[in-house]
Amino acid sequence: MQIVDRSNLEASLKLALSPENNPKRNFVQSVEIIVTFKEVDMKKGDLKLREIVVLPKPPEKTKKVLVVPTIQQLEYAKKAEPNTILTKEELQKLQGNKRAIKKIARQNDWFLIAPDSMALVGRILGPALGPRGKFPTPLPNTADISEYILRFKRSTLVKTKDQPQTQVFIGTESQQIADLAENALAVLNVIESKGYAQKVRNIYVKTTMGKVVKVELR
């Protein structure tokens, strides 16, 4: 079951990005899709989403990735140009430096960690990541992790918490409507693949500071 028609999605995105709903700001705004659900009891765990989606049309400004690689992975990590690279030793030196830890947690979107550093990251960065809804993701054991890092630079997160809805980054206002629609459909396809298509109540799109625009469902 396709949740929305692409034409309806593109029409709503065009409206959301119009001057009447999206007054010009002095920064490039993000574009988000909001999906609300019906007939679910969050306390009973009826709706659980935490899915990483690679955007087919990523924005020019990609997500910021922090990497804690092994020694063997270090040069490959540098090749992918993540926002932050920390060696295990540099990570250990952050212990107790709350200001630096909070800055790292704030300035990065994804945290890709070598398996042998996961416990250390949980202990040192965990208290700053948790309240921000961020979490460490293990790196594969292969040496060449450059493609893996690049994948996360192009990714967004579909997640639910305590409310029956998810609000997901799908790009920026500088992108083409067709590209934003393709990214939105990738998000909706994941929701559908998890069996929640029939539970969708409403879908909306908006920019960071703009008005919410409803998308007509099928």
From Swiss-Prot:
Transmembrane segments: none annotated. It comes from the Archaea. GO terms for cellular component: large ribosomal subunit. One of its GO terms (molecular function) is structural constituent of ribosome. Coiled coil: none annotated. Keywords: Repressor, Ribonucleoprotein, Ribosomal protein, RNA-binding, rRNA-binding, Translation regulation, tRNA-binding. GO terms for biological process: regulation of translation; translation. Signal peptide: none annotated. It holds the Pfam family Ribosomal_L1. Part of the 50S ribosomal subunit. Probably involved in E site tRNA release. Binds directly to 23S rRNA. Protein L1 is also a translational repressor protein, it controls the translation of its operon by binding to its mRNA. HAMAP family: Ribosomal_uL1_A. Belongs to the universal ribosomal protein uL1 family. This is Large ribosomal subunit protein uL1. The gene is rpl1.
